[in-house]
A protein has these predicted regions:
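Conserved acidic donor-binding segment of nucleotide-sugar-dependent glycosyltransferases
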Residues: 94-106, 114-120
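A charged, aromatic-enriched C-terminal amphipathic alpha-helix characteristic of glycosyltransferases
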Residues: 45, 103, 120-150
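Cofactor-binding loop segments of dinucleotide-utilizing enzymes, especially the Rossmann-like FAD-
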Residues: 13-15, 37, 85, 103
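Nucleotide-activated donor-binding/catalytic signature segment of Leloir-type glycosyltransferases, i.e.
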Residues: 5, 9-11, 20-44
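Nucleotide-sugar-dependent
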Residues: 39-46, 53-71, 81-91
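Short alpha-helix at the nucleotide-sugar/activated-sugar donor binding site of glycosyltransferases
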Residues: 74
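A short alpha->beta transition loop at the rim of the catalytic pocket in nucleotide-sugar-dependent
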Residues: 51, 77-78
Length: 154
């Protein structure tokens, strides 16, 4: 995959339980940058300039979780590579919001190549923003919650 991506950079922005191990593994690897945690505004700028973002969840742990970085990326008009299970994978695939794959190094690498070369499923920046507004915004979530309450009262 690296040979097909040319001079592309892989930038990790953040923190977390695996941050130090990831930083150690990437030390000395050309084209990999580790940026410590930044403000939400700066993270948005990184996502807006990216070709794609990556979010993952290890299967069998929090399969019900929905990584909010997916929504932050889509709101910036940037496609997502999501490696993991659950509703997020279904949303990415069905909405053509990037690439959903297993948490597998080869599948993630192929997703990166596909989006970098423009061959991955992508609804476009405007379509991604519209999808977030229609399906995962506060307004959309409020409508869904109200429908559940109305149904329970009926």
């Amino acid at each position: 995959a690296r040979a097909r991506l040319g001079d592309a950079r892989l930038v990790f922005v953040g923190q977390g339980s695996g941050w130090e191990a990831l930083a150690e593994r990437s030390r000395g690897v050309a084209g990999v940058d580790m940026i410590p945690a930044v403000s939400a505004e700066e993270a948005d700028r990184w996502m807006a300039r990216a070709t794609a973002t990556l979010a993952s969840l290890r299967p069998g742990g929090y399969d019900y979780a929905y990584p909010t970085k997916i929504l932050a990326s889509l709101a910036q008009g940037t496609p997502v590579i999501y490696a993991g299970p659950g509703q997020a994978a279904r949303d990415i695939a069905e909405g053509e919001l990037g690439v959903a794959c297993n948490l597998d190094v080869d599948e993630v690498a192929e997703a990166m190549v596909g989006l970098a070369l423009g061959t991955g499923a992508w609804v476009g920046a405007g379509g991604a923003r519209a999808w977030v507004s229609a399906h995962r915004s506060v307004e959309a979530s409020s409508r869904a919650a109200a429908a559940v309450v109305r149904s329970a009262l009926a």
